[in-house]
């Protein structure tokens, strides 16, 4: 059962029990989908709000997945396959993924999380403004801009992020008439 992934002691949803120190927006996607398709929650507001309260935010955006204490993973504590690792703030090592982040915030909004609308608006703005030479959507945004090579070449179109339009409709922040 989905609710069983909430750890009361830690105060957040556990995405993978093998790595309980890992917090990710992915754990909130089923909650978002339930609001989208059925207009009702699966989780309690406490579960959603406490999970979102653990999410770090810097310059208007947050990492997709992060270590509960250190934000970034190390080779010793990573929740990835043995041969996979990325530098701090890159890709799955605390990179920021707009679609998952916004869907998580929408779940929070539906549960009355006070920071939701601001976080959604900030994240949308950061997607376009963080890299002035690339004012378009990216697969992910690096969370540590000091890392050499943190900006991967972009395809200039990242269609998964179009899903954010649907998420904004679920949030009541846009209407299909705006298309």
Task: Give the predicted meaning of each segment.
Residues 1-5:
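Internal, well-ordered domain-core segments that constitute the primary functional module
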Residues 56-57, 70-77, 126-130:
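Charge-rich, low-complexity amphipathic helices
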Residues 64-89, 93-97:
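Generic long, charged, amphipathic alpha-helical segments
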